[in-house]
Structures are given as C-alpha cells and as structure tokens.
C-alpha cells in the first residue's frame, strides 16, 4: 500500500522543494522504506527538451530516454532509486493525453472539463508513477496561487480526501524573510501562503520554512498558531553551504520521525553515515583543483547542474575542493585563451547551436597543445574531433553539419546523414532503429581493450545516457586514426563512435554520452574521478602520457 506525501511551495519559487523532497526521501530510505519521487510541472510544454537553458536550466535525461526537469537529477543523486518518464509530468503532457482520449471517444461523447477529466488524469499519472513503493513523494512545481497550478492542487486535494490521512500527507515549503533594517523575521508571507493553500482545501501537516537565520521559538509558535500546524512540525530549513548537509539537518529536527508517527509506522533508526562522510570530506578537503568549464550558458550555472555536481562528487572521491571556473566561449573568440591559463583541467560540456563554437574549438586546441587534461562531453567530443581534423589531420575546413549546411569535410553529421566508405551520402529514414529523432537515454557502449577509457571504467562494456542528434562521420575514421586520434568506444552494433582519445596526451577524452547523469555524491563516477586525478597530477607537475602499449 503506497502512501503519498505531497510537497507544495509558497511565497516565491526556487525555494528548494526538489532538494527538500530528495533529502526527506533519502532519510526515509535509510529507515527501511522503498521510496520514489515524482515531479508535476505546471507549464504547458510537453517536456523541457525544447526549452532554453536560460528559461529552465538543465534538461535531465533518464535512463529510459525521457527529457525531464532538473529536480529529477536531485532525486537520483540523493535517493538510490532510478527515475523514468513516469516520474515527471507536465500540464502539456496531461492535456495531450486527455485530448488523445477524447479523440478516441474514451469519454463517450461527454463534455471534457478540467474537473473531472484533467484532475483524474493527474491522479492516474501520480498513482502510475508510484509503482507499489512504500512512499511516493510528489512535488508540485511552481507556487501556490499560480493559475497554472490549480488543476494539480485540486487533484492532490481529491487524493487526500479519497485515500485519507492514513495514506496522504501534505508538506508546504515557504520563505520566512529577514528584514535587515528592522532586524527581525517576518512570518506574514508564510501565514498568507498557507491561507491560500487552505482556501483550496489543503491543510498542510508539515511546514518547512526557508530562512537565512535561525527561527526564534516565539516565531515558530506564531507560525504554528496561525497555520494550524503543530509547533514541532514547523521545520527550519536554514541556508547551508553544501546541499548534502540537508538530510542530516532535517533528520536532526525530526522531520522523518514526524512523518513516521503521523502514518503510524514503526521504523528502524536512520543510518546516515554515508552522508556524514560526504559532508566531512567536503568540509575538510586535502587540496583544491581548478577546472575551466567552457560553455555559452555560464551566466546560469543551473544549465550545467548535473555536471557541476559530478565534479564535486569527484572532489569527494579525491578529497579535493573543486573550483569551477566558468568561461564564456564567446569571450575566447574575442580575447583568446588567457581565461584558461592556470586551470588544472578543461571541460567542454554538451550544448546546441552555433554561438560560441569557435571559442570552444580554441579551448580544445589549448588543452591539446598545452597538455592540460581535457574532457569533452557530447558536443565537447564532436568539437575535439573537428579541432583535431583541422589542425592535425590536414582537413582545414572540417566542421559539423549542425553549424555549416555543406562543409567541405563534414566530420560530424546528423545521425540520419552518413557518408558510406565510398563517400556517398546515405539517408536513413524513420524505419531505422535510430530514426530521425534525437538519440536519448541509456545506450550500451563497447570499450576497446588497452585504452585509457577502458582503464578508467575497468570494464569492456558500459551503459551511459545520451542526448544528441549528431555523430562522428565514419568516412573520416581512417584519416583521423592515421593522424593519431584513437577511437576507443563504440555503440553496441559498432556503427557509432562513442569515445575518442589522444594516446600521446596525459589525459584527453571525448565521449558522446553524458556521464554526469549517473554520478552520485556517495558513489561518484569513474570518469570524473579519473579526470580529477589527472588534474591533480597536472597541478603537481607529475602528469605522464597514458601508455596504450602497456595495457
């Protein structure tokens, strides 16, 4: 029997509902419960796949190929349970399903309305996503009072009534601002937010109050009195320097105990030793390294959320503080590569579009010629191929068909546009296994024996997640291999290049997949850990080229 804990937000957005939900989920998991997390997004887009990173931040890709909200990344990093397309639903996806059913005649000619048809679809999606776990934590995006959120709030209100308090609970996240000029905290925004929620028919059981300063006991009692919530269930969520402290912070305030008690559950105590170790290492690093991340969304670091966290996870494994130096790729086109000087490693992440491309290519060249550890992810791998083709293989006008419609040397092309060994363009249609769509989700990859990537993973076959439309053009494989580029990873069928590396370089890897999506703070990821060890060696002046002949 699944129990549901619904998380709503008030006053302002971006208070950290996702991290709060994920933190509570990992505590409940540590107490022996099976847990899943679901995100309901009120926007009308079907998914965030076509949204600008400036609008939405990173698009998080699940193993089954869903393009989802970045909060699902927090879910997987905190809770050792995989998520899928069933863990993220948008208004667009809900309406798409309702309209499809109406066209099929499923509603028997009835008038299709928000209540009951849309709300019933929302409830169906929530229950389908819960999938027989002990507890489903369901986060409703946006802020109470937003018109877009109303159908979702009505749906969870109905679930609370239908399933009862023994199976449903409501947690509301609010802001308790500190007014510096007055020198005091203000509880009115929280009071009014809860009043708005209660007007919809939802009485929260727990309040999590974001605050920059400790909330005095008197203010806590006032909040409890005016919101009809038990004083002990008014939880202070203070600003912390490290989000991985939050599970322990919430546990110390008894949040998991309140949840278990309200549901009448007798659970073993939580073992949070793993989280304590993570926080201890991050608080007491043995050194620090600087990684230059070259991209075009550097003004909004949420666009690289999983990548930022993966580097920090590698810092935990190597006991280093990772300083990420964000470098605007367009600035490299104007000012040269001076912004990369002093970096211990260089990373070019995935991305789309032509803006800043030449700057990224210059960053690849700088890393190659300066023998600085380089990791290119997705687009970063493709640009490493282009740079090498231009400057080492004699293909001066090498480019990708993503940026130039008819380049003289299309070393990178659409998955549907391939050159045969005879140099003829082969057009694949939608009947092909990859079709004309983006390659998404977990895909198997074979690693060549004796290569650096093979040593990094310690295995011959891996599965990593993808999100791309373009791939290396096999017509140029022999030319680039003769020039010294190693092709060390392949798709399962051997048709697509997944990994390239430079044998004569201390550490230079480009991968078509996104390893950041499978990195977690407690387990890390072998590729990022190896990348950081190479950065440490470069910093300390002990870097040596990987000898393929000895492996």
UniProtKB/Swiss-Prot annotation:
GO cellular component: cytosol
Domain Glutamine amidotransferase type-1: 290-541
Gene3D superfamilies on file: 3.40.50.880, P-loop containing nucleotide triphosphate hydrolases
Keyword terms, alphabetized: ATP-binding, Glutamine amidotransferase, Ligase, Magnesium, Metal-binding, Nucleotide-binding, Pyrimidine biosynthesis
Active site: residue positions: 378, 514, 516
Molecular function as annotated in GO: ATP binding; CTP synthase activity; glutaminase activity; identical protein binding; metal ion binding
Chain sites annotated for binding CTP: 13, 146-148, 186-191, 222
EC number of the protein: 6.3.4.2
Cross-referenced SUPFAM superfamilies: Class I glutamine amidotransferase-like, P-loop containing nucleoside triphosphate hydrolases
Binding-site positions, L-glutamine: 351, 379-382, 402, 469
UniProt superkingdom: Bacteria
InterPro entries associated with the record: Class_I_gatase-like, CTP_synthase, CTP_synthase_N, GATASE, GATase1_CTP_Synthase, P-loop_NTPase
Keyword match Nuclease: no
Region (Amidoligase domain), start-end ranges: 1-265
CDD domains in UniProt: CTPS_N, GATase1_CTP_Synthase
Modes of activity regulation: Allosterically activated by GTP, when glutamine is the substrate; GTP has no effect on the reaction when ammonia is the substrate. The allosteric effector GTP functions by stabilizing the protein conformation that binds the tetrahedral intermediate(s) formed during glutamine hydrolysis. Inhibited by the product CTP, via allosteric rather than competitive inhibition.
Subunit and partners: Homotetramer.
Job of this protein: Catalyzes the ATP-dependent amination of UTP to CTP with either L-glutamine or ammonia as the source of nitrogen. Regulates intracellular CTP levels through interactions with the four ribonucleotide triphosphates.
Additional remarks: CTPSs have evolved a hybrid strategy for distinguishing between UTP and CTP. The overlapping regions of the product feedback inhibitory and substrate sites recognize a common feature in both compounds, the triphosphate moiety. To differentiate isosteric substrate and product pyrimidine rings, an additional pocket far from the expected kinase/ligase catalytic site, specifically recognizes the cytosine and ribose portions of the product inhibitor.
PANTHER family found in the cross-reference section: CTP SYNTHASE, CTP SYNTHASE-RELATED
Name used for this protein in its record: CTP synthase
